């Protein structure tokens, strides 16, 4: 329950058909209860169950700090169907991140990852992510040892689905996500939190595309567009910074949730 008996906000439903539903997960919410976050009060599974009056089954996860599209099932059979698409890598996921520094226009990262809680001798698992630069920003403000603050907006297209894959791959590229307390740098995280008045991980699950669960031969595209102030007010604040867009359609793709060609 939320503190002092306050009601939780309604979770925005992005799509609902048959026994499948997709919602916008706000940053700071856990997908489900866990013993590692005993003091937390905001859980998507329990809140959505109470909101729509039926049990829900998550078929993938987003980190607590990540906002955006979260797909769930309303029955065990639908959960198995959706999970099979993820296992066969038929789900195309698209994320937006604000990172430290100015990365290359494109990057293909094929860097195996060992699970965070695995012993050192455990084998690393294959992990592949494509990155595309969307925009750059430079502010004449010294942070840490740098005379300027440079950040970029990147599109992340994960091919595999390892835990914390995008965050760890961006760290591998030496461009960690702003607000990432584990893989980023505290001085930059603190400066941006104070500058924007928002303390969060700047990672957003912008869209999912997958074979339509109810219509053979069709594809389903679900987006949580950054153009929606109701869903993504903090990102709208970020986008007021002086960004230099890397491609003609980069801003439109970011705002509307349009999917780039792979």
Residue ranges and their predicted role:
Residues 1-20, 26-32, 169-262:
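Pseudouridine synthases involved in rRNA/tRNA modification
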Residues 54-88:
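Glycine/acidic-rich beta-strand-loop module
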Residues 24, 71, 97, 131, ...:
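Residue-level signal for inorganic ion chemistry
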Residues 116-149:
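Non-catalytic RNA-recognition surface used by pseudouridine synthases
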Residues 162-170:
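Short beta-strand segments enriched for Tyr within beta-sheet-rich domains
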Residues 39-52, 114:
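Internal amphipathic helical hairpin motif
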Residues 76-122:
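N-terminal accessory regions of nucleic-acid-interacting proteins
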Residues 104-105, 135-141, 171, 213:
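Short, conserved beta-turn/loop elements at beta-strand boundaries and strand-helix junctions
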């Amino acid at each position: 329950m939320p503190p002092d008996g306050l009601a939780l906000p309604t979770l925005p439903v992005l799509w609902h058909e048959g026994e499948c539903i997709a919602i916008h997960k706000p940053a700071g919410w856990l997908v489900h209860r866990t013993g590692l976050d005993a003091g937390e009060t905001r859980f998507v599974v329990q809140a959505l169950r109470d909101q729509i009056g039926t049990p829900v089954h998550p078929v993938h996860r987003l980190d607590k700090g990540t906002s955006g599209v979260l797909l769930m099932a309303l029955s065990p059979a639908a959960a198995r169907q959706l999970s099979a698409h993820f296992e066969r890598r038929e789900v195309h996921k698209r994320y937006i991140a604000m990172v430290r520094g100015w990365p290359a226009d494109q990057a293909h990262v094929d860097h195996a990852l060992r699970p965070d809680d695995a012993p050192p001798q455990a084998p690393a698992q294959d992990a592949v992510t494509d990155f595309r630069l969307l925009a750059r920003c430079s502010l004449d403000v010294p942070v840490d040892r740098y005379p300027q603050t440079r950040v970029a907006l990147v599109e992340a297209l994960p091919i595999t689905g390892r835990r914390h894959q995008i965050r760890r791959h961006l760290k591998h590229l030496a461009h960690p996500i702003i607000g990432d307390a584990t893989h980023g740098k505290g001085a930059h995280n603190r400066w941006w939190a104070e500058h924007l008045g928002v303390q969060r991980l700047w990672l957003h699950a912008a869209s999912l595309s997958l074979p339509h669960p109810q219509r053979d031969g069709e594809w389903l595209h679900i987006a949580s567009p950054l153009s929606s102030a109701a869903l993504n007010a903090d990102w709208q604040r970020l986008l007021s910074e002086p960004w230099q867009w890397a491609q003609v359609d980069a801003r439109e793709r970011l705002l509307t949730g349009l999917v780039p060609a792979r």
